Amino acid sequence: LGPIQKAVFDEYCSEALDALTDDIDAIYLCHHGAMVAEHLDDPDGYIAKEIRKKIGPKVPILMTLDLHANISDTMCSSVDLICGYRTNPHVDQFERGQEAAFSLRQILSGQANPKVAHVKLPLAPSSITLLTATGPLGEVIDYGQRRQAELGGKIMNVSIFGNFICSDVPENGISIVVTARNDFDIAKNLAEEL
């Protein structure tokens, strides 16, 4: 355990970026979201940013992340949608992948032009307090899902990330990420409400 060695991270990024071609319709990143490297506090954000630089603004990038991800502004500004697990213990990875695929279909068909809003809270609770069947995190996740339903098709995704306390990085802390279908203000308002 510990930070990823720079040489290993650089090799991974080089292989991933070299594999991207001009005929790609979309990118799906399935990461944990709390990666740390010897030379980077936010490797997940770095990867998303470098992919965005290589493929340009028109190719959608979607990301599914563990509920314990440490979310950065770089991640949120580099991708079109972030979809986080809603359960701890994690039992909904498959459903979040389906949700990301459904969202991608909407984006590719022109039914959505996603806008991502991110609010970081100055809290970094320990993992034991992040159970979702009971307790405050589960209640907030449930409330976010109810608000998404109330707003109808205006919101594509509401994800609340508890953080990964063992990663001693500036990105650590609770994050609320809301993706609106096409209106940043709606996403930002809901993220701030939550």
Q: What positions do the PLM features span?
A:
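Short, structured patches in soluble enzyme cores that scaffold and shape functional sites
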Residues: 65, 86-87, 120-125, 180
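Short, charge-rich amphipathic segments
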Residues: 34-35, 39-41, 115-132, 158-162, ...
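Core alpha/beta catalytic barrel or barrel-like domain that forms the active/cofactor pocket
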Residues: 29-32, 118, 168
